[in-house]
Amino acid sequence: MLPVQTSNLAAAFTDAVRALAPADATLPAVTFERPKVAAHGDLACNVAMQVARALKSNPRELAQRIVAAVEADARAQGLVAGMDIAGPGFINLRLTPSAKADVLRAVLNEGDHYGARERGVHGQVLVEFVSANPTGPLHVGHGRQAALGDALANLLSWQGWHVHREFYYNDAGVQIQTLALSVQARARGLKPGDASWPEAAYNGDYIADIAADFLAGKTVSASDGEPVTASGNVEDIDSIRKFAVTYLRNEQDIDLQAFGVKFDRYYLESSLYSDGRVDAAVQSLIDKGKTYESEGALWLRTTDDGDDKDRVMKKSDGTYTYFVPDVAYHTTKWERGFTKVINVQGSDHHGTIARVRAGLQGLDIGIPQGYPDYVLHKMVTVMKNGEEVKISKRAGSYVTVRDLIEWSNGGDETIRGCLEQGVADWPAHFTRGRDAVRFFLLSRKADTEFVFDVDLALKQNDENPVYYVQYAHARICSIFESWGGADWESRLAELAGADLSAVTGADASAQALALGRRLAEFPDMLAAAAAELAPHAVAFYLRDLAGDFHAFYNADRVLVDDEAVKRARLALLAATRQVLRNGLAVIGVSAPRRM
């Protein structure tokens, strides 16, 4: 339903229940859902069963009294055609044809804004995602983060938040020093397995590429930094470190550009040390009595905030543990005015959540418990040519985001080749691959493991979910081209005034009504997905919407001789096309007119 329809109907039900309840009773929020069986109606409500025990009433009898009150409520007039009570007390509702027509007209009139809320109604939110160490290319796990984080940011923006996208670079610590030593070893002509090869060094071929460019005196730059020119001096480890980090940040920038992901800010971990923020946070925790010394180390009393044991902050060698700069970093988020923060990270970060939150609580600067929110995702396995693509950290072999985009794009074109040839619009060459990777990585809940099947991503049939959804959009465009010629989009406005009874009234087919119901669910689906930090729900919805469209297409001819019926069905298709476009936009996938 439209938000105003939902609001009016929920208010009518709420008042009906409140009139039957004691004045001090706590009542649940009234919600509506789609009945499992279409013949049962358009909406179902179980509020009678929810409050029956508190009101000491039989739920079915209570449902009858609620129905009687709602039927007499002016807010339900013109909205509800009838209500039935099923089972122990379910209330099934049938909406009026005019209410259904109002939804279609709203889609056509609101266009690209259908389902969106006014910007700023919720304030601002910071979404941190990807946040890969600049020690290697973006792998498929980072790709899942990018798809989840960007779609979540889009979703929150649609729901009225001012969204700030941030990428946190762990450009300090042991891993960065290991990167520098690995490049230095390659620059000296060493290879993995040689006696002098550094312990725990990175073994991937990309290390040799960095070393070659360093020796050649190449210049590289990241999107938010100054160009860095290699000195070529293999003894200058600081120069190697700076060049290697910038080189890999540039490579990650290329991958993100191909993936269609942009950030508002890149925040460097190293700046937290140079600005003194890490030391200041630790000193503040010491001053507030949140730490103690034991076994030569400094410990944080994380058990005070629910952790299973206290955690080391500063090791006996004087270095900080992994979560300490994270505490300092999150204080900057709070100080910048972001009272709502969401971190999208791999499930391997689960252990740091309690530590970071405990550190923030220990600072006692007004940060609420449970800050920040987290969306954790599980691993991705890649299948290609019917076999699992094996990865090995020791050998330095893994599937990158770039690999997935190129493989899913079809053909032999590569991103590196386009860059070397100076192709200006090179990201557009990989739209198909980008769309497939984005949609696939959102097609499961974040907390479930996912198998990315490259062979499936290349299929052009209804087995491929992104093809199935995009083809629905392209098929609708084809119908409109047959109706209105090449300039058909300019004629869509005339459909907003069409008589819609052929797709909303008593003579409408079951498929037309089902499609209309699905379109009506879009705003509420977006709101629920945003509230639950669940962008996968948008991908699920789009597959269902495409299925409803294909069922309608197979049941009802659109371009019939009866002008009124034709215009009504075209209006339904125009609304369907619009919602497909809007939903795909939320998850960052294109809506092609031809396929």
UniProtKB/Swiss-Prot annotation:
InterPro entries, per this entry? aa-tRNA-synth_I_CS, Arg-tRNA-ligase, Arg-tRNA-synth_N, Arg-tRNA-synth_N_sf, ArgRS_core, DALR_anticod-bd, Rossmann-like_a/b/a_fold, tRNAsynth_Ia_anticodon-bd
Entry keyword Lipid metabolism: no
Signal peptide boundaries: none
Q: Which GO terms describe its molecular function?
A: arginine-tRNA ligase activity; ATP binding
Query: Which SMART domains does the record cross-reference, listed alphabetically?
Result: Arg_tRNA_synt_N, DALR_1
User: What positions carry the motif 'HIGH' region?
Assistant: 132-142
Has the keyword Nucleotide-binding been applied to this entry?
yes
Name a single GO cellular component: cytoplasm
- Give the enzyme's main class according to its UniProt record, as a single word: ligase
UniProt keywords, alphabetically: Aminoacyl-tRNA synthetase, ATP-binding, Cytoplasm, Ligase, Nucleotide-binding, Protein biosynthesis
Q: Write down the PANTHER family for this protein, in alphabetical order.
A: ARGININE--TRNA LIGASE, CYTOPLASMIC, ARGINYL-TRNA SYNTHETASE
Q: How does it assemble?
A: Monomer.
What name does this protein carry?
Answer: Arginine--tRNA ligase
